[in-house]
């Protein structure tokens, strides 16, 4: 195995062709092994049917019988990764099948994690049985799927291992031999073997050969596992693998943020796999909710966030397993075959020294004091260390068997590594044990990979650029390319994060060590690192440190959009921005040759001094002009230092450098998009009265404010719709005028008649023209929805206008051109006769001298400026109101600051407008929850600015004390006593008072903006933050060298909240009307635990998992020991799977058309492609799983929905976080499907978990809480827990009344549920009153004849009857003065589970409309009769209706051929999914 891994790394280092240790390929290749092997599941695992349940397989059979080509595309998923692996092996990526082993650790770990990835990929890889798009659909969406090339053949082989039963495995013929290695290392019987070869007929198989290429391999062949001699390297791999097996259940790595491990608690909460559960009877369910879940909790506790942590670790097999101090073997022992020595302490407290030799492992006679390498007597040599330890320790043998059983019982998704590290903001106190391998990783392995790649470290730039150069013409090529890009990018992010932490921790030597620490730059592992400071006054005119701090983020945005455009021949740098310990670090790949020359010699395009000197280059103009068409960037000319015009197709700061490899690189993309004039005070710009009345322009602390790409797209779309409308109006007028002129000579008698005819003609033509307008509008919207690379070009827009002109029969081209000219002038087009909306990013840049070219038209520069101003005005006057209006329906309400920020960004609204958003929200009571979330986010962001400042002024010795003190000042009003003696503070301050401020001012004031050529190429905005003027002095004293002070000890709760108020006012222009945490909580309804969570995630703090008393008046809430860790906050660009995205969007379109089954198949294929690109574990995979689960449920397969949604929950917990908003949403969906499958108790537990997480994140006052409470109440009602049920529904009703109003359908349902519960409790009077409210709402909203209104009326009648009967009996009692013996008991009939499920579906936005077969036949006959009549009568004006009817008939006919299976929820039915606020909440109709 050593040779294979070394071969892989050598090839990767040599070529860079996707050869990086990666995440995906081991998962993908191995997934096909298991997905094709339904008869032989991995050890201890249940049989996974192609990533779905057996129900999915049945459904897949139907689809395959109907459409054979789909099966071939499904096979593509299995075949692709193996075919690519072979192709990659030629290109130097030979061992990608083993990439997962090397990716998450060094390869000595063995393949345990990769084998876990195998099963996970098998689970998700072909969910829905690979239902693919047909060839026609693929072609329609631009796919060029070569089904023949993706054809695959299965083969069954027997594997014979020493000491184990013969194993029969079904594999793909395109699998690599290496896949069998992975499979064996994951199985319980063979997992302890790492050093072995596979032989067929005594011939050793090449690990990187495909099975179909092996001579003599046929169905039923037996492959033997042969133990191989150890080398030093193989022995280390084996020891590391044993260590990983022993700590497999230990969550310590997930809490510590190591090796891309992360947490999931679903299986803990459900106490096992939901698919293995049996249906529960309602009377056997324990439904008592925890106290912290019942409505009315003031502050949710923290401990339930991590349930059952005491039992998570598993049994301990050994006390110590470490390398011996007798290492390395002396010369004489090397000649006897000794490789290394180990030291073991067993649970029986026996100590052993173990020798590793080429034959295996044995006990030697050494002690701690005496070296005696001879074998112990009696000697016992084992090829596996596990066998030896089992022989000498019975406790080890028992514990190891238990660990293995629990390991193999875990869900496959719990074992596979995530693509990026997910950090936990709270963690328990972890036991720190002896671990030599952990110590070796921390100190011996400096770069992580250099001892594994012969001759050199990884050339990140070469790998990143080579993967982008891979061919992309066919689907297999694109999948290979995207997988390679994703693998290398993931490794680069991991390495950059590790390097940035090492830089801040002081473990990397600077390339300019003699300069001020703020000015130092670093190169580590072929990555360039720069700190976030304005070191050379580079940003002096733009805001200094403030500008330098945000510049890397804007640069990252620029890299993202240029990567998305993906112009062949145009290259960007690998870029990652890391915030760690208060510092911002930018990590970038290095352009070849940049370190060998000066900056002036390197840059051939752009400017290095903000426009004083400007260069251009024909090749860059060609490439950037192509990119600019998609990004709406206007080519423009500026004057250089010699007053010569220079053409640019980007901002002037964008630099072009041709590397020694001949590639054309662009960097410094911080001004890719135009500036935001609302936050710039410019002399020659006058904003509109509406904006000035709102307080704009606001002078921001830096001048790099840019508009977002999403805003520009929305703005252009809005202007295009206006342009079409104006053009249509003018064309109508011309046409009407022309018609009137025609008719005028023939009319001589009546003067009124021409007017009448003209009016009639205009009105007759109006619908047709309106259709044209709507059609153009829909086309534009359709074009504007995809990525920026698919935005409609200006030429296409003009063609659409010309087509509209011809459709309305305007023959006079001169007049038509005049119409277009007027419309262009009205909307502000840059060209007089074309719709042209592009933006000049330099139009307001200071110091730039523009050339107002005559060919662009008169006043072109003024038009460009006006366009940028209009876009900024559009943001404030249209986009912000549209954002608020969209959330008024509460269809997908943000839950925390992160989801709020994402929603703002999707509308093109920058976070700096959050103050303005809050002002508008404050006037809307129904948006109270969003107002509160926005204020919380504002406080957290302002506090982050201040926190960074103080962290920079804190020396490492006092980090935990400083952080805990800061949290005390932020979240409490009790005593805050810094854990530093006052004597030490005064001593340090008096020592530092003299010269610390002067040192910062020793910056080199030379003309060059950078100190080295590396910096010239890469550093362009990496600076520290400063919270406000009063805080800046602390930042100026900070350095990474330890020249720190104790300013943080002077912070008090009062001073901190004063700084927060100032920061919010200066940055967001909003007044925070409170000066302490208590007043903030009282005024805005904030929860301290929510603020703690949000702040820790924002800045990277991990606190101890315990209950915190925030209102303690006697001792500080946080102590030094409560700060467990500090982790990095990483920003990077996530690569995209374009083909999978196309399949997904096509599937969504099918769903919106009501074709649920076709949509299901397309999204299943999207999931297969995502699994090929990203591996088994990724956020986008989770979105596909959620959609597939919902579709399965709508199609009547609740069991399949449960299986898929369970995987979606685990995936969301692992890749997003255990308390992420998406995870909460997944839990609520899973609870519904659990109930539908009869798991009533589990459904309640899942809802309790979702409610706890939701309240922890945002508090009880939220529309989503109302939804969850309604679900809980309904299920408790079904179980007879009426009092508990009433508490939840009362809270839900209160929230629904607040957020939806008195007449909303949500409120009607809540009143109805409350009436049902109260009637069961015998409170008929209250029930009657509540049902009256329901009836009133239904009557006003739906009318008296609606079914819901009639049902409510019938319910009122029954309740009235029961209430009268009960009152009559009570009156008898009162009149007689005593109880009568014949008073009948109140008969309470609990609702059936079917009726409860129906109501649950209604609450969650799912409505099943049942249609009998007789109804379908009747409807079909009526529609066909109508169609026949319309055909006989000739052309029908109502073409759309006719087409819709034909589609409906086809759908009914389709449904007749494929009826849902028995027991399904929808039998020959139409399933309508109403809006439910989730991503997949689209109104759909499926026959």
From Swiss-Prot:
Clu domain location: 438-680
Biased composition (Basic and acidic residues): 739-785
Phosphoserine sites (modified residues): 284
GO term, biological process aspect, one: mitochondrion organization
Region called Disordered, residue ranges: 1-94, 110-140, 739-794, 980-1040, 1456-1487
A GO-annotated cellular component: cytosol
Pfam families named among the record's database cross-references: CLU, CLU_N, eIF3_p135, GSKIP_dom, TPR_10, TPR_12
GO terms for MF: mRNA binding; ribosome binding
Main location: cytoplasm
Intervals holding TPR repeats: 1140-1173, 1266-1299, 1301-1334
InterPro entries: CLU-central (IPR033646), CLU_dom (IPR025697), CLU_N (IPR028275), CLU_prot (IPR027523), GSKIP_dom (IPR007967), GSKIP_dom_sf (IPR023231), TPR-like_helical_dom_sf (IPR011990)
Biased composition (Polar residues): 1009-1019, 1470-1487
Record's compositionally biased regions (Basic residues): 56-65, 988-1005
Alphabetic keyword roster: Cytoplasm, Phosphoprotein, Repeat, TPR repeat
Location in the cell: Cytoplasm
Lyase as UniProt keyword: no
Entry annotated with the keyword Repeat: yes
PANTHER family listed in its UniProt record: CLUSTERED MITOCHONDRIA PROTEIN HOMOLOG (PTHR12601:SF6), EUKARYOTIC TRANSLATION INITIATION FACTOR 3 SUBUNIT EIF-3 (PTHR12601)
Family in the record: Belongs to the CLU family.
Reported function: mRNA-binding protein involved in proper cytoplasmic distribution of mitochondria.
Protein name: Protein clueless
Gene: clu
